[in-house]
Design a protein with these regions (language model features):
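Membrane-proximal intracellular helices of multi-pass ion channels
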Residues: 1-171
Length: 171
């Protein structure tokens, strides 16, 4: 499990660096994305870079950090069917997919995002960040999102990510 954890952090740091982050930022953000700690080296969080590539890397790392590490181990051992059919996998990824679409709709309706692609990207990012308890942001503020969306975000925090992940240590 430690090899998976460290491997994700190293791969994330390299990907961030390749995407334009300084080595300092790349290492630190990766070390906060995988363990879903969410600390950022800039006050604007991930929005500082204004980069869809960096956002995509962060989504992948947060999703990996929120995935049951025993399931990641199975996946790395080539047991794709065991990974996909485990009860947590479709629920976790299904929740992300459905809620990303819902939040994207809210973002479009409230003018947070300029178009559908941006709304889907930002919606997916915020859903994954909240569901995994990471706390990274790509939008300026939650203050103007309205009570319905804030309530939905609160529910996502309660649902959380998978057991035996960096987000949830329940056994």
């Amino acid at each position: 499990i430690l090899l998976i954890y460290n491997g994700l952090i190293i791969a994330g740091a390299v990907a961030y660096w390749a995407a334009g982050m300084t080595p300092f930022d790349a290492i630190n953000i990766s070390m906060c994305a995988v363990p879903t700690g969410g600390f950022a080296t800039h006050g604007e969080s991930i929005a500082y870079w204004n980069s869809p590539v960096i956002e995509a890397i962060t989504i992948v790392l947060m999703v990996a950090g929120g995935t049951n590490f025993l399931l990641l181990f199975l996946l790395l051992r080539g047991k794709l069917k065991a990974f996909l059919t485990h009860i947590e996998t479709p629920l976790y990824f299904g929740t992300i997919a459905v809620m990303a679409l819902v939040v994207a709709g809210f973002f479009l309706g409230q003018g947070v995002s300029g178009d559908g692609a941006e709304a889907l990207r930002q919606g997916t990012f915020q859903v994954v960040s909240i569901l995994t308890s990471t706390g990274f942001q790509t939008i300026p503020s939650f203050a103007d999102l309205g009570p319905a969306l804030l309530f939905l975000f609160g529910l996502l925090m309660l649902v959380g990510a998978e057991a035996r992940s960096t987000s949830c240590l329940l056994y």
